[in-house]
Amino acid sequence: MRIALSFALLAQLASPAPKPGHAAVIAAPADAAGAAGAKIDLFVDVTPKPGIHVYAPGNNDYIPITVKLAPQSEVKAGKVTYPKADIATIADEKVAVFQKPFRLTQPITLDKAAKPGSTVVLAGTVSYQACDDKVCFPPESAQVSWSVAVK
């Protein structure tokens, strides 16, 4: 019994416990406005904690940061644009990462039939895997939302 408990304790110590919130994720601006048919840029500001990095898209063997908007009939989502990533050497491999605060841009187009005076609420999920110089943590997700006033 003691041996089994010892192995269980060692297994817990050997694998990192999930630490939620390895990066601060904020929708910016939380409130936006545009006319029906207008293109609007929504932003996600991400600040990794010190010593933490998240992977940029294009690293085949790693989980990159992504933004996924919930389907919304009054909005068409465009392709997310990413800032230039840092190139880091991790485990003798050069990979694109974000280590400092950065901003993702999520373009949207309001439907031409959107009613002036209405508000469109958009919800999305930012998913990423945070790592430090020794280990990668389980993937994390953060919920973001914006209110878009139709002019």
Label every PLM stretch briefly.
Residues 3-12:
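Sec-dependent N-terminal signal peptides
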Residues 12-151:
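Extracellular/lumen-exposed scaffold segments
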